[in-house]
Amino acid sequence: MITANMSAGKSTLLNALVGKKINKTLNDSCTAKIHYIHNKFIEDGYIYEYDHELELNASNEILMNDNEENDTTDIHVGTKFRSWQEIDKRVCFIDTPGVNSSMDKGHREITDDSITNIECDLLIYLFNGENIGTDDDIRHLSYVHDHYMGKIIFLINRVDNYKTGTDSVKDTLEKEYKDLQKLGFKNPEIYPVSAYAAYLAKMALHKEKLSEDEAEELSALKRRLKRPEFSYEQYYKKTIPRKENEDGISQLLINSGIIALEQLLYEL
C-alpha cells in the first residue's frame, strides 16, 4: 500500500514501478478511489481495468478517466510490470487517495479506513522532499503510527532540485530519521528516490514515445543524477548488477533509486 499527501509524487512513483503510465499525475485529477494495480505474469500487450465495467484492453483515455457509474471505492488494473528483475510472484500495489485534498475531505476518510482495515505486506509512506515536515505530514504520520502495525518504508521524493552546497540529501535523510523517531517510529527505514527520473528512464528504455519536454528533462536528469550526492542507490546499501547501455538510461535507473527500491519490495 502506498500513502502520501498530495504533490508528493505518488502517482509518478507508481508509474515508475510499473514502467507504464497507468495513473494520473495531475493534482486536480485525483479522485476518491482506491486503485489496485496487479502485476501480470506475462507481457501480452494488454492492460485490463475493472471500473464498474471490465475493459480487457483499456486505452489511455479509459485509464485516465474514472467511470462515474462505479459507486464503489475500488478500481482494479492489471498489466505486466516492467522491472529490472523478473517478478515471479503475485504483486499488487494499493494506491490510496492523497489525504490532504482541499477539494474533497472524503479522501482522508477512505485512506484512513484503508490503512486500518486492508491487509498488506508493506506500507510505503512517500514524502515530498521539496516540502517536508509539514503539519499535514505530521497529522498523517501520527495516524499511520497509531493504526498501522506492519512494516513501513519511508521514501523522500523530489530532492532532484536540491542545490549543491545549500541543500543536502544526506542531511535531509538524517533529519527525517530523527523526526520519525520522535513520532514513535522505531528504527525507521528511509530512502530517497527520483520517481520522475525512474519513470522517464523506463519509458525510454522500452522505446515509449516521450514528448519534447520529457526528452529534455530526461537528458537533464541523466546529467544531474550522475553527481555523487544524487546517486540515490548508495543510500539503500544494495548491490545493483550493472546493465550498461550507450545512452546512459540504465545508469539513470540505478541512480534514481528505483532499482534498489524494487529489490526491497520484491524480496518480501
Describe the residue ranges of each PLM region.
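Globular "head" domains of long coiled-coil molecular machines
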Residues: 1-267
